[in-house]
Each structure stands twice: as C-alpha cells, then as structure tokens.
Amino acid sequence: MNITKAFCLSIALLGASNMQAITNSDFVIQQDNTKINNYQTNRPEASKRLFVSQAVEQQIAHIKQLLTNVRLAWMFENCFPNTLDTTVHFDGKDDTFVYTGDIHAMWLRDSGAQVWPYVQLANKDAELKKMLAGVIKRQFKCINIDPYANAFNMNSEGGEWMSDLTDMKPELHERKWEIDSLCYPIRLAYHYWKTTGDASIFSDEWLTAIAKVLKTFKEQQRKEDPKGPYRFQRKTERALDTMTNDGWGNPVKPVGLIVSTFRPSDDATTLQFLVPSNFFAVSSLRKAAEILEKVNKKTALSKECKDLAQEVETALKKYAVYNHPKYGKIYAFEVDGFYNHVFMDDANVPSLLALPYLGCVDMDDPVYLNTRKLVLSNANPYFFQGKAGEGIGGPHIGFGYIWPMSIIMRCNTTHDNEEIRKCVKMLRDTD
C-alpha cells in the first residue's frame, strides 16, 4: 500500500492504515480559508460516549499530528471514533450490539464495516479486542436466528416491518435476503483472527452459522427449486422495497450463481444474480474454508466451502463477463443465467467498483479495469457529475445524488496518486 493510498484509507474509511510512516510532506492538500478555531468537535461529551478506547484516542492524536490540512484533521477526529462514540453497545463480557447510525437495529453488513477500522488496534487495547469479539459473536448469533435476514433487533421487541409478507420473527428488524449479509461477518471474523491470533470466536455457534451459510447459498442457487424457500413482499410506495411475481422476484436459470433478492442498498435486484455479491461470496467462502481447516479441523466442511466457491467463480467467468462495444470485456452488475445483463453500478459495497477493496479481484485485472472505466463514466446511469464533485449514487437515493462511499471506493481502487488526491479533496469539500 503506497502512502497516499494509506492516507486516503485513513481519512475516508476511518482506517488509519500504515499511517506511522507518513510525514507532513507526503500528502498535501491546499488549506482552506476557515480559521482553525472555527473547527470544533462534534463528538459527544466524554461521559456520553458509548465506548472509549485509549488505543483509538492515541491513534487520533497521532494522525492529527501528521496532517497538514486542518479541515482533514478535523474530519478525521470526528469521523474515526464515531462508531464507538454513538453506536456500540458492549455488555462488558462477550456480546456487542451495533446500531446502524440513527436506526436502533443491527445490520450484518453495516456492523461488519463499522468496526472494521478498529481491528488493527485490537492488540493494543484489551477492552477493544473484547468488544470486537463481541460483535463477531453477535453476528454469528444473528445468522443462526435467520440467515435470510439483513437486520436484527437487540432483543425480541419486533419492529416496523413485522407486517412484511415473509417469515418475520420478533428478533428481526428486517428480512431482506442479501448475499453480502452472510459475507461481512466472515470477512470481519477472518480479519480479527489474522490480526489478533484469537481463535476463541470460532466456537460451536460459528460452526452452526457457517453450516447455515452454506445451506442458504445452495438453496439460492435454485438447483432443486426454481423459486427457493424465500419470498418477500411489502405494502409500499417504493417499487424497490418489494419483489415481483408474488414475492419470488424475476426468474433465474440455475447456472451455479447465487440469487440475491436485494442489493446492499436494501433495494430489490432486477436480475437476481447480483455479480458483486457473488464475487464477495467466493472470497468469503475461501476465508471460511481456511478457518474451518486450520482452527476447527473440519476438513469436510472446509472442502464444501472451497467447492462452492469454485463453482460460483466458474459461473461468474461464464455468465458475468460481457463484451461491451466501447469498453471491451466487462463485468455486468446483474445477470439471470439466460444471458440477460444489467449494466450499472451502485455506490453500496459490494459494488463492481469495490471488488479489489474486498479482495475479490486484483486491482490490475483487465476485465475489472474496463469495468471501472464504465462505472465511472456516463455509461453508468447512476454516475453523476456536478460542480462540487462526481461519483456513483443509486436508486435508493435517486437521480443527481452521489454517495461519498463511491468516492471512497474510487480512491481505494487505483494506483494513481492524482486520482486519490482528487477523491480526498472531493470528500473534504463536500462533507
């Protein structure tokens, strides 16, 4: 990782990766005209912060000393601890529930991404390490409640979506089937294990969860049943909050890919083989296979993960690649096995743009590079440009809006330092 890319990951993804090597001359963006004393903290009072980590506070102080741009330093100071300050509910033992921002529910995807930047500091702070282990254990528990659900309540209090026409339970906040909901917990657990060496998280709860992941993925390959066991309908004015065909969605041909009824934006898929999420499933299954083999000594279950990953990867190469008249070979966003394709990208991760960030493809993969050119151009119907910046949005927020997440992914999927600087400047100027 080059220094400017590490800087970008620090500021944009709240990660502070490899920042120890940075000096003030490594990354310079022109100062704005705001006086330093106008930048005041937006953090809660110390007594009202939900979780405090000395390792995180030390990292904030360290990074601020390295930054020459006052506004970026101010943004980092407010953004990096925000998850700990406002969303983490740790019981002090082995359970952590993470609110997704202002919604008092825990998304498997969001929680896995929210605490990700703190894993690198876990070995410096025992309480932080315990809190992170608690997130992972809670995620496994959630999967075992219902592997088809995307968001969970802290207890069994029910919620606003209990009337959805699907198999709702009081523990669920929402039950939208999204492949990535089962991938993010594996990714987080693997990263935690590799960073800390702590394998205690891979208990019987984990073994039950990964068995359910495999079962769910295979069900949604639709080989045995063209519909599968999952259906979803909602009474709503938003077309993308419900599914066609009485809740089953548009048909797919069973070719080895996995159906994702909803996107990571929580919007319904058009063609149900969502390509970025299938790539994410491949990388996650291989991580799970390594854990099962090295930690649990479950060689048969490990092989099952490897075999499924290989099957999905083979199907992606055959059905997800399209020879575009302008950009050459590219990855489609969605396919259905009948050789129909959707060409676009959405800001939410996993996305086509974010594939290298998630470790799904190499950043220099020629098909990815062609795809990247397409999704960062007007050939992507959800790529927008304005006076303040440019980037990818999505139907969840509508026309003319870009999500900072897409700018973040853009600067983490390039070797070009000038492109990285451009992205960081946009993030700074549009906060």
Ranges and model annotations:
Residues 22-109:
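Low-complexity, Ser/Thr/Pro/Gly-enriched N-terminal "stalk/linker" regions
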Residues 1-8:
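Bacterial N-terminal signal peptides that target proteins for export
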Residues 104-132, 136-240:
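Aromatic-rich carbohydrate-recognition surfaces in CAZymes
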Residues 8-15:
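Bacterial N-terminal signal peptides
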Residues 387-431:
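C-terminal hydrophobic structural anchor segments
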Residues 75, 126-142, 199-218, 288, ...:
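Extended, well-ordered alpha-helical scaffold segments
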Residues 54-68, 113-126, 184-199, 279-298, ...:
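Well-ordered alpha-helical scaffold segments within catalytic/enzyme domains
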Residues 108, 144-148, 152-155, 167-170, ...:
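Extended ligand-binding clefts on enzyme/binding-domain cores
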